[in-house]
Structure formats: C-alpha cells, structure tokens
C-alpha cells in the first residue's frame, strides 16, 4: 500500500483552518438530501448495515475522496454496543487484524473492502478508518445483524365475518410476527395465493368492493427476505358475503377483532397507506381529515382511495393524527383514529467549528442534530472516543468541552449523531498553537543544510540565554502539479530578530532516506513589526517538484546572531495530479479601489453556484504593471472574505492583480488580471514632515529605498544653497555699483567707466590673479591732449581740494599677447598726433605761456612734477596713476589709440 495520498490531509489538519464539514453520508434513503460537499479528505461512501444469515459472507465497502496512507477497520460486539434504541454504550471499538479466517481486508486505491464471515462472534458494529499521517477520518457505524423471524406468542385467532356486498374489509394477519429484515407477506384464499389490490404493510390484507366471489377462508405466510425462512401463520379469517336482497340498512360499524384506532410508524421517504376499517349497509363513504397536519389531505403527495388514504414520500411534518369518518346516511357515523409517527434519521444542523487554539486553553465545541427518535451525540478525537480523554467532557446538551487543550488534540474532531435509523457525522480541523519553549544556546544543529553547522558564538557564562524562537511548521497547499504554497507564522516573542528564512524540503520514498534540499531564495523577514496578536505570517512557493510524490517541508530561520533554527517539519504531503482533484471556485475581481498613496483595496465575488465550503482562503498576487518580475503574494484567510487591503505600495503607480482560492488540498485557477493604481501624492504645504499616529491614514509617498524618503531634506538643502548664492552675487553687484563714479551724468567730458574698468581694477580690491603673475615692465605713453585738458581742470579745481579716490586705478596684467600689427598701428597714430601737437605748439608758443609741455621725451622728473601723479608699485612693471578725463568721443578714440601698452 502506497502512502501517497495520505500525507495530503495530514498536513492540512494541523495547520489549516477549515469550516466544519460533514464527513460521511448516513444511511439515508436515496430521496433524502445529502450534506454539502466538503473540502479536503472525506468519506465518500461509508459502510452500510447488513442483515445476513449465519454462515454467509458479507462485504463492507469504504471509499475516501483521496487515497490514504492506509485503511483500518474497528469492531465492537453489537449486543453490548447499544440498547434497543440504538444509543451508544461504553463498549470500546477494537482494531481488526486481517487474515484470521473470519475476515479479510483489501485495498484498491481509495477503496477498502472488509469481508466478514457471519458468525455469532462477528455480529456487531464496524467502522472504516482512513489514516492521512496523524490525521484520522472515521466513518459512520455499520451494523452486521443476523437475519431472523419469530412469532410473538402462540395465540391463534379464527375470525368469521359476514358483510354486505360492496364493502371493503381490512384483516390484520401478521400482528404477532417479528422479522429482521421486514418480512414479505403472501395471502391465500382457500389455499390459493391471491394478489391484493393494495400492497398493505405489516401483514394487513385489504379487500375492496367485496362480492360473493370474495367469500372463502383466508390465511397468510411470512417470509424472511434475507434468510428465506418461511413462517405460516396459524390465524385465519372466514368471509361470508350476503346477497343484496337479504341485507338490511345498518349504520357503519367495525367487525369483530378490528381495532378502534391504529398507531402507524413509518420511515421518512416511504409511502404511507392508511386504511379505514368498517362496513355498513348501504356501503359507507370515507371522509378524511387531520387536526394536526396542515393541508394533510389536499396536496400533491396525497391520494384519496376507497376507504384509504395514500401519502407518498412521507416527511417529518406528516406526523400527527388522521381521522376517518364513515357515513352511509344511517346514523351514527363511524370515526376511526390513526396516529402516524414518521421516523427521521439524524441530521446535524450545527456542525462543530474550531479555530486556532493555544495549548492549555479551554475550548467548547458545539454540535446540534435533529431526528426522530431524538439522536444521541458522541465525539471522536482523531478516531478515539472523547469518553477516554481525561481533558474532555460532554455536556448534557451534547457539546464537548476540552478543559485544557493539548497537542494530542490537534487533528480531526468529529461529532456523531445516531438513532436506530442510522448515523451522521460532521467534523472540523482543530489547530493547537503549542506553548513556546525558550531555546537554550545550542552547539550543534539537526538535519542537513543550514541546520547542521556548529554555532561559532562564544558561550556567555552568567548571562541570560539567547532566545531563538523558531517559526511554526509550514502549511502546504497544492498550486500545480509541480509546485506548492507554504504558509507559516512566527509567534509574538521577544527573542532574537530574524533576518530571513530558507525553505527546505525532502522527498519521502520507501527506499533510502533522501537529504534535505534548500531553495535558493531568501525570504526576507521585513520590518520587525507584529501584524496581529498571533504574530507575523509569511508565504512562499516551492517549484520544480514531482507529481505523485510525497514530501515534507520545514522552514529555516536565520537570526541576527548569524545562527539559525529550523521549524518542526510539516506532515507528509502527497502532490496529487490536478486531474484527480475537484476544481476549486475561481474568484472574480470586481474593483481595485484607490485607498491611499500606499494602499489599494481588492473587491471580488464568487459565482452564485460556487460552494464556499470548498474554500479555506485566497491568495492575492500583485506587481507593478511596468515590471515583468515575480509577483508579490498575500494570504487572505477565510472563505467569506470579499475584500482585502494591500499596503506598502508605491504612490501613483499602476499595479496588476490576480486572485485564486485555495483549500488544504489544492488551489483554483487564477482570476483574470485587473489593473489598479495608488493615489497620487498630495501637495505639501510645509517643508517639515508630519508625524502621524498609528491609526492615522498614511499619506506619505512610500518607497522600498530608504534614501528616497530623504529627498525632501535634500531638496531643501539644494534650494537653500542656491538662494544663498543668489544673495551673495546680488550683494557683490550692489557693492560694485556703489563704487561707480559719483559724478556720472554731470558732465559729458568724463570717460566711460565701463571701458576703463576693462583694463583697471580699483585699489584696495582683490589683487590680480597671482597664478598668472609674472615680472614684466610696463611703458605707459601719456596722451598729450589729456595733459592739456588736465591743466584746464587744475585751474578749475585749485590745490587743496580732495580728489576723487574712485579715480585711482592700477593697471591689470594683460592676459593676452598683443598682435604686432596692432602695435605698429598704435605707433603710427602716436607719431601723427605728435606732429599735430608740434605744429600747434609752434604757432602758439608766443602767446601761451602757461601751456603744457607736450614733449614726450621729457625727463621723468618733469613728468613727475607736471604730469599726473604717479606712484611706483612694489612690484616691477606696475604704475599707479590718475587717469586724465576725455572731453569728447573723438578724444576718447584718440586716447584709446594713444594709450598703447608695451611690454
């Protein structure tokens, strides 16, 4: 027997939260409704009760929705197991061993067959048990009973009736017979078998519209359909039919031996025939009514017959009193009361449901059922009776209380409701969150891969041990034929920070033990913030697996101290091909709501005919629409969820989303892709960021890059620097403007300062570029016209008046080489100017005693005395001088040609 499928449900049991599900079908009639299908593993076909004679061989069949690791059968003796009402006794079930000559167990994929030889010591109750790892699913009980037929007492009745023709006669032949299964009846008239018009039950013979041909002696015979045993009833009835001429008018009345009332018990779904005994002359007519049952007579299931009422597909609400009135016009009328009881197999109306429970907490599981007779409830915890569990107590209303939940309770919890008509079961997965045991510093790891190395951290003697809280065992869900999805969580703790996770898995085979394989991806822990009271949840997928193989998985956590610790391993998981699984409902994405700059809300729905019981939760996949990378994943627990918020997104970014539903066994197809975007960032009115509370809505622009969040500060720094630079430049320009000549605009004879400043800089300002300084001699040729103009100005400005300090300049060192052609042009212009001045001087030499000496070859002493004031610089080749002013544009041009500089 291959352990393939069994692992599938085992894993789901311990880590997956499912709604309560009906596990198997009770032995209802075919017409009765069956429980809705359930996710995961369930009993598709439970063994059925059998009545057989001694020495016969019977076969019990049990089928599960998935192939388990193994089947087992349990048994307890029937006489001690239940009383006549079918209530459960204290006798315990025992597991059967095949091959002892009395029974044999065979298995074919997901079907198990138990062959039993009917003997007194094999009569009793049988159960089928499917093992899926630590998960146990138990079927309802099937009974093996001996076929028997017996007669209650030996009282014989011999009746003689005389009736008028046209009446109907009811004879109860088999009131004293008890048969298992119910006997079939044969009727004889004068030793010849007859076929009654109406197939009455319980040995009742009903003769309608009798005539003289109906007269004779009637007898009956009971046959056991299982064993074939026949019992001839010694009672008889002799019928005499009067002629029409000899009959007298008589009111309706009962014949001798006929009861005045009846009590009828029938099973739900059967056909009920009510007969109204009584004869009269003339023939009476039957009228039916019921004070208890609404519309008991006038409905589609009821048919009124001559002296009878037939109700098909009897329901529980047909229970009540029916009254038959016989009237033939002769008073008084005859009333006949029939009390009808409809027995209903048990139905669980409130199945148990369990959530994740912490170890040591108290838990109450509720289960309610209906049925006639009232069903009795009992519980199984992973196939074991709750009566044998010291922590379990069943309340009078049938609820189960676990005073202290233990790890052994994790698994499948089933509630059973039973009466003499059958059983029904519903179960739920119980998850137990174990108490966290603080880990001591360890020297070696266990297993392979990351967990097998020796910790290199030194031992801190006398200090509190380092706490490394491991993650929970992963919950496995099938995604495809080659991939699964793992879900796990880290409980709230104050231990070491987890940096990232690794996923490890290994294949389980019957041969050599396989080593653990480690995936390449690091699953980041993220921000050290708890998402809920239970801790923080994570999701990861594992691909490149092989279908029809069994695997185990575990999660490896790497901590901030560079050590690691692995979780407990998952249950064995059988990766079943998708073709063998029931398809899951596919959700339909309706809308992607823009919730904030960092979050959106998904809205979806299921088809109207989709069964939510198949769903454990949903997987949401999302990524930026401009990206072709991997999808981010989010897990949504609960089948009833119809919306979910996804946060930590980028502002003003378009994303694409898709959904799929999942259960403990498989996942659905993906929904159609739908795009949505986050809100645009809001305009900020202040340079300082606003600190928000925990409950405030996040309106900041999120980013996965921490440096991007500092961009407002960086922008402010750059802006402030630019503003400061502008202020400095403005101040410099303002100072330069203030140092411009104060007399600008007062006379047209002032030289243009912009042109002069191209060659000179003010005294006291920054010195010329020192990097390009070099020693050179500068020869300045004075403008003769300027000397004459300067003499005139000196006459207007007597000595003693202060001169304008702004007119003092020193000449810049030239940064270019003069063109020799320009130098020759300047020399020729100078010579023409000298000749002109000489002519003018010769003509006016006698009359101009105070004229300036325009001889350019004058000595340096004369030039120092009469010319502009000149100051030698400490550096060679530099001359500080007061520049003569030009009186006109032509003079400026002449000055420009005469002020040639030779180096």
UniProtKB/Swiss-Prot annotation:
Residues 470-578, 586-681 form the Fibronectin type-III domain. The chain crosses the membrane at residues 713-733. Heparin binds at residues 506, 512, 514, 552. Residues 851-863, 887-903 have a biased composition (Low complexity). Residues 39-144, 134-236, 252-341, 346-433 form the Ig-like C2-type domain. Keywords: Disulfide bond, Glycoprotein, Heparin-binding, Immunoglobulin domain, Membrane, Proteoglycan, Repeat, Signal, Transmembrane, Transmembrane helix. It is a single-pass type I membrane protein. Glycans are attached at residues 85, 104, 148, 209, 339, 388, 475, 568, 705. PROSITE patterns: FN3 (PS50853), IG_LIKE (PS50835). One of its GO terms (biological process) is cell-cell adhesion. Residues 427-476, 676-703, 786-903 are annotated as: Disordered. Residues 21-712 are extracellular. Residues 1-20 form the signal peptide. It is found in: Membrane. Mediates response to the active Hedgehog (Hh) protein signal in embryos, functioning upstream or at the level of patched (ptc). The first fibronectin type-III domain mediates a specific interaction with Hh protein, in vitro. The second fibronectin type-III domain is additionally required for in vivo signaling activity. This is Interference hedgehog. It comes from Drosophila pseudoobscura pseudoobscura.
